[in-house]
Amino acid sequence: SRETGFIRELKRLGYEVKLNSSSLPAAGTVGLWFRPPEFASQLETSPAAWNFIYNEDYYPFDWRGLKKFPVVLTPYRELYEHYARSNIRTAMFTVGVNTTDFYAPETVFQPGYKVYPLVYYGDNNKSSPLAESLKKQSGNNKPSPLAGSLNAQNSTVQGSVWFMGRFWENGLPQLVPQGTPAEKGRELSRAFIAAVYADPETPAAKMVPAETAEAAAAGALVIMPSNPAVKEIYGDNVIMYEKESDFPGLVDYYLQNPEISRAKIVAAQKITADRLSSAASARRFKEILDWLRQNVEP
């Protein structure tokens, strides 16, 4: 599951972590809560100096009326928008993705190897115009014309378009990878290109989408709209475009230049593991605590 790498690394660093425990943290310690039963009432009586809540769900917990100050750890930076809209007092830190599930140590490029030409991540709340167009063209069971054209250009590619995100699970379930995060990660590790979409009108477009890190860690070349936060971390190893009409040409170029693609994929994998994995976030735990003590009153 998504939290595994983060919690495993915390334990390795010497922190005591109790999950779904009926006992409360000791006074003066740091409490880490992961989906505990009735966590809100437990938090109110927790004697811990700081109470961290790990939220792996895309939408926030409902804790209106909670007097304690919780600190949220989440893979989804977009969650901050939800908490701010609800006027919930909190601090939030992104703990990245679990590269145990999503990291593929080696990406294979060889003639005849079956790869998927496109893994398309639709935004959870709003799809891209390109995705809408593909949906209308594909029908219920037909492959996308875009995938077909890519397949015609490169005989090693088997045409298929994958969509990920809640928007697509009802509309085009046959195009959504199914299963556990590890199973989806294996699908991504067999992908050639992952197209990540972040609606430019939302705060997510100014942050690193979780899908970007997951796809990069799994060994797919990421192509996405221009995003300064992603550019700062990944540099030119994530491909970006200003106009959606440029997207098919970029896909064609990188499909026909696998060595260039491979170099960017390997570099993006390493960046993800070093900077955005949940284990990397756990190594910053002391830094997070120091910041809280200096800047926030519990």
Task: Give, region by region, the residue ranges found by the protein language model.
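A charged, aromatic-enriched C-terminal amphipathic alpha-helix characteristic of glycosyltransferases
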Residues: 256-290
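Nucleotide-sugar donor-binding catalytic core of glycosyltransferases
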Residues: 1-28, 35-46, 55-236
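Conserved acidic donor-binding segment of nucleotide-sugar-dependent glycosyltransferases
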Residues: 238-245, 253-258
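Short, hydrophobic/aromatic alpha-helical segments in well-folded domains
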Residues: 68, 211, 250, 267-268
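Generic C-terminal helix-cap and adjacent flexible tail
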Residues: 290-298
